[in-house]
């Protein structure tokens, strides 16, 4: 089983169409990886599906970096 970090990075790479090695924890989805607002919504939906969790809109707005996504998932795993 892949770690949460590996799974998040894979989802980010797939959703944003970037190479997995470009996805590092400090990268911002918008500033560094070229995401737009639709990309970020789709990314949150993909994370919700992968980790079987619901991310409220007010929380989703705070998830702007790869590390923030990893931290959120780790904090909300059942």
From Swiss-Prot:
The keyword Lipid biosynthesis applies. Belongs to the acyl carrier protein (ACP) family. Its main location: cytoplasm. GO terms for cellular component: cytosol; membrane. PANTHER family: ACYL CARRIER PROTEIN, CARRIER DOMAIN-CONTAINING PROTEIN. Coiled coil: none annotated. GO terms for biological process: lipid A biosynthetic process. InterPro entries: ACP, ACP-like_sf, PP-bd_ACP, Ppantetheine_attach_site. The modification O-(pantetheine 4'-phosphoryl)serine is found at residue 37. NCBIfam families: acyl_carrier (TIGR00517), PRK00982.1-2 (NF002148), PRK00982.1-3 (NF002149), PRK00982.1-4 (NF002150), PRK00982.1-5 (NF002151). Keywords: Cytoplasm, Fatty acid biosynthesis, Fatty acid metabolism, Lipid biosynthesis, Lipid metabolism, Phosphopantetheine, Phosphoprotein. It comes from Pseudomonas putida (strain ATCC 47054 / DSM 6125 / CFBP 8728 / NCIMB 11950 / KT2440). Transmembrane segments: none annotated. The keyword ATP-binding does not apply. GO terms for molecular function: acyl binding; acyl carrier activity. 4'-phosphopantetheine is transferred from CoA to a specific serine of apo-ACP by AcpS. This modification is essential for activity because fatty acids are bound in thioester linkage to the sulfhydryl of the prosthetic group. Pathway: Lipid metabolism; fatty acid biosynthesis. Residues 2-77 form the Carrier domain. This is Acyl carrier protein. It is found in: Cytoplasm. Carrier of the growing fatty acid chain in fatty acid biosynthesis. Pfam families: PP-binding.
């Amino acid at each position: 089983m892949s770690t949460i970090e590996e799974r998040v990075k894979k989802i980010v790479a797939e959703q944003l169409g970037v190479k997995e090695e470009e996805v590092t924890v400090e990268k911002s989805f918008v500033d560094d990886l070229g995401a737009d607002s639709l990309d970020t919504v789709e990314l949150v939906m993909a994370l919700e599906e992968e980790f079987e969790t619901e991310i409220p809109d007010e929380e989703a707005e705070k998830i702007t970096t790869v590390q923030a996504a990893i931290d959120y998932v780790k904090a909300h795993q059942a």
